[in-house]
């Protein structure tokens, strides 16, 4: 049996923390950076006005708000890590479905776009509500404020980088 010093939770950047921060950076850079910009440009290109764009974005956010307390209530039964992976799957699945909406016409297209965005943000809600409790279990109490600080700094930094990338992408592919 190893000593207390061998416990990975005694290390600030242990494997779980590194994996979490990497996933958080990818999610923040893509979802809050590139995806946010490209989604609105995509909807404009499809001919939708600001009212529909507001509806689509609002539907995603309300689904996030609904999913968060439900996921939080289920965390003890299902587990933080598993729920975070389920949430990431929702983000990937919903954002992957979004572009296929361009193949439809009329109401079907609008419903597809709103529902796929809602799936994306439902997944985000499930992920984000479980991330801090997950992080609490990855390090000892005296390191938690440092890990939370790193986590908090990761989101806007990655979102900023993703926004820059998202702003350049249309020019590269137009």
PLM-predicted stretches and their roles:
Residues 89-107:
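C-terminal ends and interior cores of transmembrane alpha-helices
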């Amino acid at each position: 049996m190893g000593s207390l010093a061998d416990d990975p939770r005694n290390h600030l950047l242990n494997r779980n923390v590194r994996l979490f921060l990497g996933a958080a950076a990818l999610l923040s850079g893509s979802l809050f950076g590139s995806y946010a910009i490209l989604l609105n440009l995509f909807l404009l290109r499809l001919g939708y006005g600001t009212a529909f764009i507001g509806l689509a974005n609002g539907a995603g956010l309300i689904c996030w708000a609904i999913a968060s307390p439900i996921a939080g209530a289920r965390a003890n039964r299902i587990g933080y890590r598993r729920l975070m992976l389920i949430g990431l799957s929702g983000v990937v699945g919903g954002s992957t479905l979004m572009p296929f909406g361009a193949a439809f016409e009329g109401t079907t297209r609008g419903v597809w776009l709103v529902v796929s965005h809602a799936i994306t943000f439902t997944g985000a809600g499930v992920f984000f509500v479980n991330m801090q409790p997950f992080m609490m279990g990855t390090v000892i109490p005296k390191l938690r404020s440092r890990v939370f600080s790193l986590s908090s700094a990761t989101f806007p930094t990655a979102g900023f980088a993703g926004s820059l990338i998202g702003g350049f992408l249309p020019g590269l592919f137009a």
